[in-house]
Design a protein with these regions (language model features):
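C-terminal catalytic core of Y-nucleophile DNA break-rejoin enzymes
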Residues: 170-190, 204-225
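Basic, Lys/Arg- and aromatic-enriched nucleic-acid-binding interface segment
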Residues: 106, 118-146
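N-terminal core-binding DNA-recognition domain of tyrosine recombinases/integrases
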Residues: 9-25, 31-108
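Short, basic (Lys/Arg/His-rich) helix/loop patches that form interaction surfaces
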Residues: 223-263, 267
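Catalytic-site neighborhood detector that most strongly recognizes the C-terminal catalytic loop/helix
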Residues: 265-290
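Conserved tyrosine-mediated DNA breakage-rejoining catalytic core shared by Y-recombinases
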Residues: 147, 151-187
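DNA breakage-rejoining catalytic core of tyrosine-based enzymes
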Residues: 90, 104-120, 173-183, 199-205
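C-terminal secondary-structure termini that scaffold catalytic or DNA-interacting sites
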Residues: 1-5, 291-302
Length: 302
């Protein structure tokens, strides 16, 4: 839990106004970034910081965190200060004068798991509890975002008249329905059985993934689960986001249409595929997108 007590009553009141429409996980994420900056500034009033102090803070996070995290911290704080400027709490947004950390969107072979590496993950599944097994296979076979997995509810799992199973992912313009791999659904059934839930999946608003202390799970929980699994498999160089990269790159390498990948991953633009063009010559000639027809992926023997 973040130490929110270092925020003044006024700062916390402003944050609550700013975060009214955010979901709980996003709200917590924003708050953690604001508290981080407050701590760095030795609890100086956030309404009185200068562009120089903001720049020093961004330099600090660039030395401490990954580039993508630095970009996120900058974007969150820029948004928060824009809100304060718009509501006349401050005269100007100091982050306007701070250079945004740049992150390359081009993916390389270091961002992509090979089929052999995915097989290594499958081999270590027995070391994980049933919930964590479902999470790992779900990430590997759907290409979903972490927040989509975290927010998954039982009503999002669909079965057609031929007993094919699908999952509804995303919201609004990014909402899409993708097919579940049979082994992924088998694990989901095992997970329900272990959790004492009925065999029939009812369309409830309950979250699919929970913890012993909560009826939901957080992004951080998932990252820790993925890290543990990757460490077991000797693949600690990867992280949770690399499952999505792998899904996209390997599918494109096998010749999947950019429009199909756009729909599967919820991209707003099919030309996001350009991000992956440099990796296509390095990945295996198998596709996670079509793993149900792939004899080289051990998941199909489960």
């Amino acid at each position: 839990m973040e130490n929110t007590t270092i925020l003044t009553d006024k700062e916390f009141e402003i944050f609550n106004q700013f975060s009214q429409k955010l979901n709980p996980n996003t709200k917590h994420d924003y708050l953690s970034k604001i508290v981080l900056m407050k701590a760095f500034l030795e609890e100086k009033d956030l309404l009185e910081v200068t562009k120089y102090e903001c720049n020093e803070f961004i330099d600090y996070v660039k030395d401490k965190y990954a580039k993508s995290t630095c970009e996120k911290i900058y974007s969150y704080l820029h948004s928060f200060y824009n809100f304060m400027n718009k509501k006349k709490y401050i005269e100007i947004n100091p982050f306007t004068y701070v250079k945004k950390p740049e992150v390359s969107r081009i993916k390389t072979k270091d961002d992509v798991l090979s089929v052999q590496e995915i097989n290594k993950l499958v081999e270590i599944l027995p070391k994980l509890n049933i919930r964590d097994r479902v999470i790992m296979i779900f990430l590997a076979t759907t290409g979903c975002l972490l927040n989509e997995l975290v927010n998954l509810k039982w009503k999002d799992i669909i079965m057609d008249e031929k007993n094919n199973t699908y999952v509804r992912l995303g919201k609004n313009k990014k909402e899409r329905v993708v097919k579940l791999h049979p082994y992924c659904f088998k694990l989901i059934e095992d997970y329900r059985d272990y959790s004492g839930l009925s065999e029939v999946i009812l369309p409830t608003n309950d979250f699919v993934f929970t913890t012993q202390k909560s009826n939901s799970i957080t992004d951080r929980n998932v990252r820790l689960i993925v890290k543990k699994a990757l460490d077991y498999a000797g693949l600690s160089q990867y992280s949770a986001k690399d499952f999505r990269h792998s899904f996209a790159a390997i599918s494109l390498r096998l010749g999947a249409d950019e429009e199909d990948i756009k729909k599967q991953l919820g991209w707003s633009d099919k030309y996001y595929a350009i991000r992956y063009k440099y990796v296509l010559n390095f990945v295996d000639s198998e596709s996670v997108d079509y793993i149900m027809n792939n004899d080289h992926l051990s998941i199909n023997n489960k």
